Amino acid sequence: MGPAVATGAAAGQRAALIRRYGADPDARSHGETFLHLLQQRLQPRGLYFLDEPETPLSPLRVLALLAILRDRAAQDCQFVIATHSPILMALPGAEILLLDGETIAPIDYREVEHVRITRAFLDDPESFLRRL
């Protein structure tokens, strides 16, 4: 009875994982898998801490993540996100806090260094490349 119970439990867990996440997670890219898992795990009224969630994502997928976060915020989810992504920092209604090693203070999106540097680079990439 012992091995049959263990085998049955493992088969049940495998079936539940397949139902929730799909039969072949390797069929998706790393970023697609990340977004899929995130969508499956987020529950209404949850509090979530995300550390650089943009890391496995292309810019287009970062926009998809932004939409997921916006939709979940409408379901009363709260997010604390450590990010370098100007795209994620642009989430409507986000409170951006700057941690400088000594203090934590609110900062306007347009004043965030990553936003200013990205904007300046996109406005004139040749100027930046000459200074490298």
What spans do the regions from the language model cover?
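C-terminal lobe/lid and adjacent interdomain/linker elements of RecA-like ASCE P-loop ATPase modules
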Residues: 60-78, 85-132
